[in-house]
Amino acid sequence: VNYNQLKTLFLSGIPNDNRGNVVINTKGQTNIVLSGSANLANFLADLPGVNYNFYLAGLGRPQPYEIPFWPNIIVNQISDPDTHDQALIRSINLINTQACPVINHPEAIKNTSRELIYQNLNGVDGLIVPKTTRFSPTNPQDVKREIDEQNFTYPVIFRKAGDHGGVSTSLINSEADIKKTLYQYALDGSAFYLTQFVDYVDSDDNYRKVRLIVVDGKAYLRHLIISDSWLIHSSSRKFMAENIKFDEEEKDYFIGYEEKIWPKIKHTISEVTARLELEYYGIDCDIAADGTILVFEMN
């Protein structure tokens, strides 16, 4: 196919709660930004050929699959099976009407929920995926029962399925801590995750989270964030801003990544990519000195 004539169909998903954000980019253009989707189309607007972003609905009435051309390739941007299961089903139905390659097939995305990542990647050499279960508690006793029946040991991480960025995430340190921790949650039968906490504190009493972006089996460094808390997100950069040496550490990490880090993790990343069957995905993790990857999130 001549790239100047390439017809690319991007698939985006409206979450089950039917919510999204409208933003204005630096060119003054209006873009729809949806949670749980990679939103690649917004950054690839200048691709040659014809590009079309098709939005697949979440819950609601049946949706006609009206596309203005037959695509040469389909790029699925939907990345969260917890919040977009209906959109994923619809994207699979649409793809089945086409006859072209698909990047990040929705069938593979369905296998990237936290508990399936644990089940499917367990045993990969050089990879630690903490035990994770999904359940729907209606009271604190349900949480205690899940901890006991699944043989978790304290502390454990409790979070609502589909939430990211540390939202609705708590650490339960003991049985006595359950009620005190869970008062803030509406335990209405919604899906939650329990994850075995693995302490990854470094010798300086700080924590380090690495974000990798894997494309075609090659892991690229996105950032290194350092914090005095185990729960690290973008807001943790405030801690780094107050400690200039950590900014320098991140810069040095970038400089040395290809030579010092990538050789230690490439075989693990290769096996993970083969199991996930994804062309691109992200990993939030800790990388030990020997290259062992402790997974926080992967999708």
Show where each model-derived region lies:
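Glycine-rich phosphate/pyrophosphate-binding beta-alpha loops
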Residues: 166, 228-230, 299
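Active-site nucleotide/adenylate-binding loops and adjacent lid/helix of ATP-dependent enzymes
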Residues: 5-20, 97-99, 107-208, 259
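Conserved metal-phosphate-binding beta-hairpin within the catalytic cores
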Residues: 250, 269-299
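Phosphate-binding site of ATP-dependent enzymes
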Residues: 170-260, 264-267
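Short, solvent-exposed loop/turn segments at secondary-structure junctions
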Residues: 15-16, 60, 80-81, 109, ...
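Generic beta-strand structural signal
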Residues: 104, 214-215, 287
